[in-house]
Amino acid sequence: MELGLSWVFLVAILEGVQCEVQLVESGGGLVQPGGSLRLSCAASGFTFSSYWMSWVRQAPGKGLEWVANIKQDGSEKYYVDSVKGRFTISRDNAKNSLYLQMNSLRAEDTAVYYCAR
């Protein structure tokens, strides 16, 4: 019985730690085709500089689509073909922040954008 209670307690602690991770996106808005937007993501609750980070998006009525990701030190970046040459992912480890500069926006870029660890 003691072992069972200890296990439940350990699970509760681990879940509590996981819940502290926060990724808060900002910078979205309405823009005409051809326009630009810069998205930001403020990270907390984990060592930001230790992780690859990504942007994903979900267009209305569709599933999640990976957009771009960036290595811990920013030295490697990858993009889905549809945004290459238009979107730029970047990060500032000193500010625990991730960015997505979106230029030459198209109607098909309409989506909810999320940052992901």
From Swiss-Prot:
Cystine bridges? C41-C115
The segments labelled Framework-1 in the record are 20-44
- Where is the segment annotated Framework-3? 78-115
Q: Which residues form the Ig-like domain?
A: 20-117
The signal peptide, as residue positions, is 1-19
Task: From the UniProt entry, list the residue stretches annotated as the region Framework-2.
Answer: 53-69
The main place the protein resides is secreted
Keywords carried by this UniProt record: Adaptive immunity, Cell membrane, Disulfide bond, Immunity, Immunoglobulin, Immunoglobulin domain, Membrane, Secreted, Signal
Which is one GO molecular function term here? antigen binding
Give TM segment ranges. Answer: none
Report the SUPFAM superfamilies cross-referenced here.
Answer: Immunoglobulin
* Region of interest (Complementarity-determining-2), ranges: 70-77
Which compartments does it reside in?
Secreted; Cell membrane
Specify the superkingdom: Eukaryota
Q: Which GO terms describe its biological process?
A: immune response; immunoglobulin mediated immune response
List the residue ranges of the region (Complementarity-determining-3): 116-117
Say if the entry is tagged with keyword Cell membrane: yes
Q: What does this protein do?
A: V region of the variable domain of immunoglobulin heavy chains that participates in the antigen recognition. Immunoglobulins, also known as antibodies, are membrane-bound or secreted glycoproteins produced by B lymphocytes. In the recognition phase of humoral immunity, the membrane-bound immunoglobulins serve as receptors which, upon binding of a specific antigen, trigger the clonal expansion and differentiation of B lymphocytes into immunoglobulins-secreting plasma cells.
> Subunit structure, per the record?
Immunoglobulins are composed of two identical heavy chains and two identical light chains; disulfide-linked.
State the name under which the record lists this protein. Answer: Immunoglobulin heavy variable 3-7
Tell me what organism the protein belongs to.
Homo sapiens (Human)
Gene (UniProt)? IGHV3-7
